């Protein structure tokens, strides 16, 4: 039993009804690895304060500050699943850019150029990446394709994908293709 859990992750999408998805993977108990049951929770906007660059053998991470004040809540968490956290997004004034984007069918994905949206310096930017492998039949839906960062700017800042980027939207040919879920070490 856990009273609370806090972590830095990324808002993945907000639908037209104001429902959001974030993180790209579930929140698990640090001791048992079991998916936590969440009865209620709040989504807060975080401020990224530092970046530990990822390198071989070390995943790197975004570190930030979460202000646990009522005025900082931008949504409610009502679901924790293996594919992420979900709930109601109710503060569009948070300055988070939400842009209508078509969703790609998994059959449309292909090895080749893609991009990820993430915030490493105070604003959301699109960075070049590449889908290098696709497995349509992988038993874990969180591992249906592999993406590598190719953008020189993001590689310089983070070394690639780091902890805290989980949930970052992945785009291919202008369509929403998925979310960052894991970091390769």
Each model region followed by its residue ranges:
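Short beta-strands and strand-coil junctions in structured, solvent-facing domains, enriched
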Residues: 7-8, 28-32, 154-155
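Short, structured beta-strand/loop micro-motifs enriched in basic residues and often containing a Trp
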Residues: 93-99, 152-159
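Catalytic nucleophile loop of clan PA
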Residues: 158-180
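Charged, low-complexity helical/coil segments in non-catalytic cytosolic or luminal regions
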Residues: 12, 18-144, 183-184
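Short strand-coil-strand connectors
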Residues: 119-123, 150, 173
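Terminal peptide-recognition signature
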Residues: 1, 11, 170, 174
